[in-house]
Curated annotation (Swiss-Prot):
This is UPF0298 protein EF_2453. Keywords: Cytoplasm. Its main location: cytoplasm. It comes from Enterococcus faecalis (strain ATCC 700802 / V583). It holds the Pfam family DUF2129. It is found in: Cytoplasm. GO terms for cellular component: cytoplasm. It comes from the Bacteria. Belongs to the UPF0298 family.
Length: 116
């Protein structure tokens, strides 16, 4: 028996487009550009996921369709999602002094509106 070669898994970079449409009837035309994740019938928009390298070319093609009002790119991959250093950790409240770091601990209590 031959040993099977294992391929290393690489995470595919993906991004979503929000496509605002005039009507939802020709919705099947959008399937060729990516995975349709959500359709809002009330607000008339479609969320499509596709590979990152195809975003710019597909945005131009989708925008030229007759039933498309506008196309917006999702900025979620660009937003820093690590909030551990922002709120409630010791690293967020370090102040540098002459002899090193002094940690100033602050109370980070979250109160709900119904308990106030």
């Amino acid at each position: 028996m031959q040993a099977k070669e294992e391929k290393e898994f690489t995470l595919q970079e993906r991004r979503c487009l929000i496509v605002w449409v005039y009507t939802l009837k020709p919705l099947k035309q959008l399937r060729r550009y990516g995975l349709i994740h959500y359709v809002s019938r009330k607000m008339k928009y479609v969320v499509i996921y596709m590979n990152e390298e195809n975003i710019e070319s597909n945005m131009e093609k989708i925008n030229q369709l007759h039933f498309v009002r506008s196309v917006d790119k999702s900025y979620r991959p660009d937003v820093e999602m690590n909030f551990a250093e922002k709120i409630g950790t010791k690293a967020a409240y370090q102040e540098q002094e002459d002899d090193g770091y002094v940690v100033e601990e602050l109370s980070t209590e979250i109160r709900l509106a119904e308990n106030v």
